[in-house]
């Protein structure tokens, strides 16, 4: 999906670009009968970045292609956003997957402790789009120019580093910065 829909969406966009550049066909729905691999990144229908749910995938397996492999990428949890339903939902959705990819070891351990299946799983850290995030034109801060701060987080969720942003904001009141 185009637009600022978070890390999972950017992961999907970057993966799609990489696969297509390497002559692989990528589809964003479950209409084709010969899909080799389904990647579940957001199984919650209520999310705007969700293309399909784990139930849609189960139906695809049952009625269209029983040989498709399913990978579930997990990058969300209750502890991160102080919710109460996400972990249970993702653990249930994960039962559809053949393989699980976690975005961090911490997240993997959290879900293993909470009872997610111990099937094939790996931690794969997210990478950045090198056309955007690179050191072209980089120069060391000379402490005379204004300090420029860039964050990869966006949104109004207080659990995404607000305490750090608040400390930075207080530092900016100091004439040194």
Spell out what each predicted region is.
Residues 1-30:
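N-terminal subdomain of nucleotide-sugar transferases
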Residues 1-4, 41-44, 151:
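Nucleotide-activated donor-dependent transferases that construct or modify glycoconjugates
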Residues 23, 27-96, 106:
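Extended catalytic core of nucleotide-activated donor transferases of GT-like folds
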Residues 67-69, 99, 120, 176:
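Proline-centered loop/turn at the N-terminus of a beta-strand
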Residues 82-84, 112, 127-146, 160:
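Acidic anion/phosphate-binding donor-loop and adjacent secondary structure
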Residues 95-120, 128-132:
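A short, active-site helix/loop in glycosyltransferases that binds the activated sugar's phosphate group
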Residues 124:
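Hydrophobic residues at beta-strand termini and immediately following loops
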Residues 140-160, 166-170:
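Conserved donor-binding/catalytic core segment of Leloir-type glycosyltransferases
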């Amino acid at each position: 999906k185009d637009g600022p829909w978070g890390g999972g969406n950017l992961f999907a966009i970057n993966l799609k670009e990489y696969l297509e550049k390497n002559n692989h066909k990528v589809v964003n729905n479950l209409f084709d009968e010969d899909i080799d691999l389904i990647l579940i990144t957001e199984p919650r229908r209520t999310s705007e970045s969700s293309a399909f749910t784990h139930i849609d995938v189960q139906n695809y397996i049952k009625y269209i292609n029983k040989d498709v492999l399913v990978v579930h990428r997990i990058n969300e949890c209750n502890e991160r956003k102080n919710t109460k339903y996400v972990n249970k939902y993702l653990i249930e959705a994960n039962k559809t997957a053949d393989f699980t990819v976690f975005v961090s070891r911490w997240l993997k351990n959290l879900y293993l402790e909470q009872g997610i299946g111990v099937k094939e799983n790996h931690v794969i850290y997210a990478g950045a789009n090198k056309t955007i995030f690179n050191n072209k034109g980089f120069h060391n801060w000379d402490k005379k120019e204004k300090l420029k701060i860039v964050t990869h987080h966006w949104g109004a969720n207080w659990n995404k580093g607000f305490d750090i942003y608040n400390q930075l904001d207080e530092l900016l009141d100091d004439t040194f910065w």
